[in-house]
């Protein structure tokens, strides 16, 4: 029997947090190996396990996977979170790319110089309210189903709910005008594994902050 997936990153949300969300929603227990020094990263590179010399990296099923989207897709396909046919997968991928576009602004913000963070926050609030949230609310309204695609839980639903949490941490009440998104958030938050993940003391990381920025400098620069 294969062991638990092992996640290689540093002690932050960053690009690994969405992977944590997907594994959690799929009911998969995982281990983490957190880099703390530049030497930890260099050892992974020297060992030849980082194809493009970068993390996140996930050890799973005998593979050492890098590139976030590839990791998303493997987890989703393995755990039946990727639609029933090629058309559903295309929609799931399309929605996921939109989610990732906005989440990218959020996950990079804490690592910007402090004087640039306020402008980035304003951009996040604007794009969430006027571009991304209305688009996903419209999708849910168009078919009246519980999930974005095929009336079945997919990676897009999970990553969207992570995004909703991320935006609301920065802008409380951001989903107030989007009742279907709120309902989706509640639905997925009540999945037993996700409910546990959202509790204090779980493997969910706190929001990235100045401490994470300093750790990243030590490891990556």
UniProtKB/Swiss-Prot annotation:
Coiled-coil regions in this chain? none
GO terms for biological process, alphabetical: glutathione metabolic process; xenobiotic metabolic process
List the InterPro entries: Glutathione-S-Trfase_C-like, Glutathione-S-Trfase_C_sf, Glutathione_S-Trfase_N, GST_alpha, GST_C, GST_superfamily, Thioredoxin-like_sf
Q: What is its EC number?
A: 2.5.1.18
Claim: DNA repair is one of the keywords in the record: no
Which UniProt keyword terms apply here? Cytoplasm, Transferase
Q: In which tissues is it expressed?
A: Liver.
GST N-terminal domain span: 3-83
Residue ranges annotated for the GST C-terminal domain, each copy included: 85-208
Family from the record = Belongs to the GST superfamily. Alpha family.
Name recorded for this polypeptide: Glutathione S-transferase Yc
Organism of derivation:
Oryctolagus cuniculus (Rabbit)
